[in-house]
Amino acid sequence: MLRLKNDRFIRALLRQPVDRTPVWIMRQAGRYLPEYRQLREKVPNFMAFCKTPELACEATLQPLRRFPLDAAIIFSDILTIPDAMGVDLHIAPTVGPVIRNPVRSAQDVNRLQMPAVEEALSYLFDAIRLAVKALDHRVPLIGFAGSPWTLACYMTEGQSSKTFLTARAMLYQQPDVFHTLLQKLTTLTIAYLNAQIKAGADVVMLFDTWGGLLTPSLYRQFSLDYLSQIAAEVVRQKNGRKIPLIFFTKNGGQWLESIANSGCDAVGLDWTTDIGQARRRVGDRVALQGNLDPAILLSNPESISTAAVDILKSYGQGSGHVFNLGHGIDPSTPIENVAALVEAVQNFSIKNEEPINSYYR
């Protein structure tokens, strides 16, 4: 098994020594890149684009040609699993995801398909294999999925929402039905992530984008318990190498200790949590990822550099930190501001030199 030329990201996730803080950016492959917008012109339909392995691979690689990032993330969408289950998914250009047959009853849940993941989502695994080959062991490749709760939000609401009131109401009105839906999603998510690892993903991440909408009690019952189940059943070693698992719950700072105890290797933070305080709260249980406010990337390089350094100082010395945004990059972000961010993180965080590929031996 060939080792990665740059395993800084994985070492930080496992809280092993690194020469500097690794950096990557959520949604680093996307609309802020002019070359991505040009690529999308070939296949305007978003899901059709995701289902074309060669295009998904190219989108994955594009940000690494511009910026010296420490990881690639496969280009895809969290709604691939609901799509494979038979919901009528449409991505509207100005609206976002729309599900024309929302899941709102026991009958709706029972009608959902439970496909063989490696067949139904083979396009994603083909894209991973292409990306692994193209990366040629330069940096790790991240695979990902949406959390069961977040996927269920879209499936029950029928579209994106700031509140997901329909989904939240169902938790009170039909809790057993909702648990059945979540268990189906959990079963498929485990198979999905394991198939991504089999195809070549070095790290996997779960995006619990809407977990922060829940009460503390409901968060544990309807989100965290299912995340813990995934952590227990996802492959964590392959060919003698550890496969780190990252959990990201937006607005989940109040439950940081519980998330840290859920079985993941690293916890993603949004920008509303102080990373220094977060480090003190979790101790040496998990690594932390984050957590620059994406809005600052719409300002200027000087402000961006200052804010990035503030986060690095707040975290302090030692490993266990992966620099990232607190959520996905905004499509209107200027390219030069992304470059300024990456440069600031790299220049400030350089530590005592040591071999960065010593983990994969």
Curated annotation (Swiss-Prot):
Major location, coarse class?
cytoplasm
Which residues pair up as cystines?
Answer: none
Report the EC code(s) recorded for this entry. Answer: 4.1.1.37
- Where in the cell? Cytoplasm
Against InterPro entries, the record matches this protein to: UROD/MetE-like_sf, Uroporphyrinogen_deCO2ase_HemE, Uroporphyrinogen_deCOase
Binding of substrate occurs at: R27, Q28, A29, G30, R31, D77, Y154, T209, H327
Is the RNA-binding keyword given for this protein?
A: no
The answer to whether UniProt assigns keyword Isomerase to this entry is: no
Query: A GO biological process this protein is involved in?
Result: protoporphyrinogen IX biosynthetic process from glutamate
Pathway per the UniProt entry: Porphyrin-containing compound metabolism; protoporphyrin-IX biosynthesis; coproporphyrinogen-III from 5-aminolevulinate: step 4/4
Q: Which UniProt keywords apply?
A: Cytoplasm, Decarboxylase, Lyase, Porphyrin biosynthesis
Give an example GO molecular function: uroporphyrinogen decarboxylase activity
Record-marked site positions (Transition state stabilizer): D77
Q: What does this protein do?
A: Catalyzes the decarboxylation of four acetate groups of uroporphyrinogen-III to yield coproporphyrinogen-III.
Q: How does it assemble?
A: Homodimer.
Stated name of the protein: Uroporphyrinogen decarboxylase
Q: Which organism is it from?
A: Coxiella burnetii (strain CbuK_Q154) (Coxiella burnetii (strain Q154))
Q: What is the taxonomic lineage of the source species?
A: Bacteria, Pseudomonadati, Pseudomonadota, Gammaproteobacteria, Legionellales
The gene designation is hemE
